[in-house]
From Swiss-Prot:
Name of this chain's protein: Protein SCP160
Main location: endoplasmic reticulum
Record-linked Gene3D superfamilies: K Homology domain, type 1 (3.30.1370.10)
Biological-process GO terms, alphabetical: chemotropism; chromosome segregation; meiotic telomere clustering; pheromone-dependent signal transduction involved in conjugation with cellular fusion; silent mating-type cassette heterochromatin formation; subtelomeric heterochromatin formation
Modified residue annotations for Phosphoserine: 54, 63, 85, 87, 89, 630, 1112
A single cellular component GO annotation: cytoplasm
Membrane topology per record: Peripheral membrane protein
Modified residue annotations for Phosphothreonine: 50
Amino acid sequence: MSEEQTAIDSPPSTVEGSVETVTTIDSPSTTASTIAATAEEHPQLEKKPTPLPSLKDLPSLGSNAAFANVKVSWGPNMKPAVSNSPSPSPSAPSLTTGLGAKRMRSKNIQEAFTLDLQSQLSITKPELSRIVQSVKKNHDVSVESTLSKNARTFLVSGVAANVHEAKRELVKKLTKPINAVIEVPSKCKASIIGSGGRTIREISDAYEVKINVSKEVNENSYDEDMDDTTSNVSLFGDFESVNLAKAKILAIVKEETKNATIKLVVEDEKYLPYIDVSEFASDEGDEEVKVQFYKKSGDIVILGPREKAKATKTSIQDYLKKLASNLDEEKVKIPSKFQFLIDAEELKEKYNVIVTFPSTPDDELVSFVGLRDKVGEAITYARSSSKSYVVESLDISKAHSKNLTHAKNLIMYFTKYSVLKGLEESHPNVKISLPSIQSLPTAETVTIHISAKSDEANDIKAVRKELISFVNNIPPSETLVITDLDYELFGGSIKHCLLASESSVAFVQFGDYYPNDNSILLVALTEDEDFKPSIEEIQASLNKANESLNSLRTKQNNMETKTYEFSEEVQDSLFKPSSATWKLIMEDISEQEGHLQIKLHTPEENQLTVRGDEKAAKAANKIFESILNSPSSKSKMTVNIPANSVARLIGNKGSNLQQIREKFACQIDIPNEENNNASKDKTVEVTLTGLEYNLTHAKKYLAAEAKKWADIITKELIVPVKFHGSLIGPHGTYRNRLQEKYNVFINFPRDNEIVTIRGPSRGVNKAHEELKALLDFEMENGHKMVINVPAEHVPRIIGKNGDNINDIRAEYGVEMDFLQKSTDPKAQETGEVELEITGSRQNIKDAAKRVESIVAEASDFVTEVLKIDHKYHKSIVGSGGHILREIISKAGGEEIRNKSVDIPNADSENKDITVQGPQKFVKKVVEEINKIVKDAENSVTKTIDIPAERKGALIGPGGIVRRQLESEFNINLFVPNKDDPSGKITITGAPENVEKAEKKILNEIIRENFDREVDVPASIYEYVSERGAFIQKLRMDLSVNVRFGNTSKKANKLARAPIEIPLEKVCGSTEGENAEKTKFTIEEVGAPTSSEEGDITMRLTYEPIDLSSILSDGEEKEVTKDTSNDSAKKEEALDTAVKLIKERIAKAPSATYAGYVWGADTRRFNMIVGPGGSNIKKIREAADVIINVPRKSDKVNDVVYIRGTKAGVEKAGEMVLKSLRR
């Protein structure tokens, strides 16, 4: 040969010990020009070729120092797995040619491999020669071979692809086929086979290898890390093709199992509160390992790349072992009555120690679990803290004549309804511990424990007192115990009936706590009523609740009862809850939707009692009679199923058959497969052996299942791969919904467009329709458009918390995704970000327009900063910000979302006012601000003197008057606080505006605007005003309003002063023969007086109601007013009002008597008032008295108070009594 051979560094591969291969390539140091030049210098080398090239056959290429000696890398005596590639010396000169040609790498390679004689087919030398010549011709390669004692070595030269194919053909034709078996995870079998067997066919056809994937699972092959078993895949063919196919299959397995989900279960619950797995989750981008801990179930789930997940599992197991060694549990014996003193929450927070109290009343061992050094500290702290408590016991079984049963009932009532919760909340420092309901049946006393810290012992007495009151207020007569309804039959129905009356009668079903207890406790609720009902009323409410259960009693009385003879052994075997027969019986009875009770070993050990309503009892009797008539467990029954359904009936390794056997507790015999081969299209007779009742159900089940199996079909739908994700849905939502809805299996292949749907024909067709409709929708709405948006405006498109982009998505029904971040190099370079919009064509266009409008709006966004002196800021903002709001409104800011006017706080040194928004808006706002500043620069400030008591009128309710003045006259009005009497009121603004504002303030707002003024001594004001009724009379009769100036507060206080009523004297008797309905009492009390000094100023103003604007027929008419007539009416009304006030003042000294009318029925007091107050007005005018009818909410609400002269009081009293008697 004329080219130097260099061996590759990697060792040759060996397959089944029969082939050894060495692959060589042309040296890169040898060029075509070098070889040509050398050939001219040494022509003799071409004339004497040697069959086996060696180093001496190669031409000399420059200095000999450039290369080391190289052994022959092939031939009969070659030794495999040794690489002899020479490396040039560092001092070697580079090889050059006189032509200066560029060096080139040859595409040719050489590959040597060895075949053991044992693995070769027995062929003659001519046959071998014929095969070699055929390979050389078919693949355009050079093939040479040598034979040694135990092997034959081949050297194949040529283009790389051709060499590999030539080698495959040589190995295939010269060697015996082999059978290789590899184990693969069972979950990977579907991927290896592919949709419709497509993947496995491709591998088999490509490498001409027969591949068989076993349906069975290898025994003892479960791997808990993979959560899977393994199955065998066998490959038959020549060893080279088998290895290539094996590599392809293992690549699929590697891809399918690259990620793992590993579950660790923490068996011991006491470790759960202390486990923290956050440190085990790695953060390596796509290679992240996620660890989740489910505290309730105790499961630790690890998700991530398989090897990393396994390593994480090992780390967590080590962590759990270390945690287990550090945790300790100590049990301390603590009497039950003191266990409640241990604050488990406090110990958990302070020492991280979990306290578990015993579940049974007899158990006094309390468990403390935590870190070894903390458990002892926690127990010590619990002991010391409990010593600081004082505990008192209250034995409520001593109440109500030592009625122990009633005391137990009260505890059940208190527990269910948390009756004592309000008491605990009102005394937060006191703990109340009720005995557990489980301990009540055997308890000889019922003791409630009350505890508190020593320094709060007084609270215990208060709580004890209230507890005694609670117990005493619920005597046995206010409860009722019902025992005639069966809880097992009607427990749910009883609860439903009693819930309707729970607001008045509480109830406790003992069956909720104790098995086979039919007792129901009813408790009458009387706490919410003002007066406790009589015992008759309480009994009536209890009986009403009891009677609501009569419909259930009727059902119970109408129930049929029947007893069957079954031996004790048969009942324990056939009818125990876990038996297959019992489950079938319960299924049959539940279909009847009735009430049924089955009691085993009742009334005798060898008897069974059935009780229920007609429908359910009839079904149960039929079942038990059939079992009695055919009690043998050796009964036989046959069922015919299609032959093609037998495999499904049996299932994988008989799993389905075993499940059916267990479900119906019967033996199922299927004829051998050999007997069925000739009748694949016919049915197979399956024999069932067992209890006849079970066999009837099994036969029905098998017939239905066989029909379902025979109806299984597969349908295909072509779905472009890009739509797979949309049809599968997030986390498989859509696919899972269809699979569950139609009981089908839907397979989406990874790299294929054909989606398969398999299952019952009806379900497959329905699922196919829905999937096709969804695909059509996705294809219609799957159009995409990419638009470029400026990176600086991306936040504006997204909006706060994504509001803007979510609104666009919802409005136009599109998906929007930014393909880059604003910080990406490409985005920073171009200044734009790509936004992808997915949806229908029209919706995409509309959404794109919306985005463009946002970008345009953002582009129009400007910022302008004004430097304004602080003294003008208040003028710009205005009182309550009303001026600033007006500025924004005038500039059109109400319809603009992205705008702002930022004015510094009063205490800030910053003078900058920042205006942001569209150019037009900013321009208008700036103009308005500059205008205000200009006006403020030309403004004047004027001080006005206003009495301190009138400052409030200038401000108005909530500052409304001041704001109106500032807005109306464009001024700034300063009113000092009430606490600053020396403060001056100032008006700042344009001179003409200040003058107008001052005029309005002085002439309209603070002017004392009244017509007459009368001073009434405060001591008799209550009588003069008739507690406000006289003021109302002036307003209604004379159109005269009364105001009180600075004495308003005092006047209101006197008019509403509480009335002192001597209840002992005036109240009548309500009991016995002397019971009264009304009582009238009169006494002399002296002239009206009050401790208040000074006068009450009554300022009278004539304010008639103007009815001129109320026109008839909806037409406006001019009404000519007679000014002189109105003035005369005004004077007359004012004179009359003043006269009436003075008369009341003159009569006050003679109003020395008070009258009290008591009424047993306060509901009749409205008869005194009359419609619209007409009757009471009539009494006041006729008797000239003060009369006060109490409200229901008054402290004393059953006495009418009268004040006046003796004659007036007597007359008024008679009129009141007359009104009550009507």
